[in-house]
């Protein structure tokens, strides 16, 4: 897919246009007792998106499929038009919410065949997304993580420096210090203190090294020495009495819509789970993307005690495959934490009703739910989420119906989930390692 030469110019012109902002419906928190940060993921910009009478040529990401209902903010068979991404960031900028920082967990390029992209075009898309964020949020520290599509060929992120690693190291310099830039350039990962909260460290992992389709890391026990680096970094944070938020693209654990399928290779998943268990007192939260769905997980120790909260954020892109029945509405989210110990207090999930936005020609981003209010839990701590998971697992759980509706970001309230479907969801929420996950399936399937 050749990107037009005047692409960046077009982006900046679009940026000056008002995409139509929704009224933020989140509660106002005037007291400084609550800190906040945004999480955005899976932008998947498709620069070819345009409205045309030939619905097989609306976007490269539809791969020639007939796009039935294209509008200014996209279509479910297409990745994001720039106007959709801009509307998301404009909503964040004008939401009235004060945030200390933003995490951005990867995947800027579109889902298109390998031959339609190149290293240059992938870097160009990442550049344009970075420039958009930096222009809209010049004073906000942003912590990116690389996704499996943030490379060419897709998924093949290497164990040593590359053109993409070097390019993002230069692009993200305004947000990171020299040490972070150095490890990012070498292996696509880094750690960085939050400027406004110096005892909080962000660890941005390159979990794409552990992704099944990545042939560059086959038969390697510690690709790019990231495991060793991670343990050293967490040990240092433990000694220095820091708290850590772990961010990455591909999550730990099992996919909630598949059977016995970890999001990454089994060996690597077990290794990460082991590290996270040993340093659970340091890690105050884990945040991922990749699945395009809204889900949570609770990491437990080997005795079944909940020790870590894990959040997988839904995508901004609404894209789905032709044969898929369900997809997601575009979403972004805001986390609230307790300054000092960085305990996660709440999460506010915002979304765009894509059908409505296209009909009206304006984007009305609204609050989909506030986690504590939606589920009646005290906070986002592991014990609270473990209790919620137990509620979700009960027979005829109304809480689970709500959870499954939010899983697709309120895309389709009639989406069915039979007993097998529910079991896969519950087992994925509560079991991140092989032994406990398989035991869960044996007990419930």
Swiss-Prot record:
It catalyses: 2',3'-cGAMP + H2O = 5'-pGpA(2'-5') + H(+); 5'-pGpA(2'-5') + H2O = 5'-GpA(2'-5') + phosphate; a ribonucleoside 5'-triphosphate + H2O = a ribonucleoside 5'-diphosphate + phosphate + H(+); ATP + H2O = ADP + phosphate + H(+). Pfam families: ASMase_C (PF19272), Metallophos (PF00149). One of its GO terms (molecular function) is ATP hydrolysis activity. Its EC number is 3.1.4.-, 3.6.1.15. ATP binds at residues 111, 148-149. Its main location: secreted. GO terms for cellular component: extracellular region; extracellular space. Keywords: Disulfide bond, Glycoprotein, Hydrolase, Metal-binding, Secreted, Signal, Zinc. Cyclic-nucleotide phosphodiesterase that acts as a negative regulator of innate immunity by mediating degradation of 2',3'-cGAMP, thereby inhibiting the cGAS-STING signaling. Specifically linearizes 2',3'-cGAMP into 2'5'-bond pGpA and further hydrolyzes pGpA to produce GpA. Also has in vitro nucleotide phosphodiesterase activity with nucleoside triphosphates, such as ATP. Has in vitro activity with p-nitrophenyl-TMP. Has lower activity with nucleoside diphosphates, and no activity with nucleoside monophosphates. Has in vitro activity with CDP-choline, giving rise to CMP and phosphocholine. This is Cyclic GMP-AMP phosphodiesterase SMPDL3A. It comes from Rattus norvegicus (Rat). The gene is Smpdl3a.
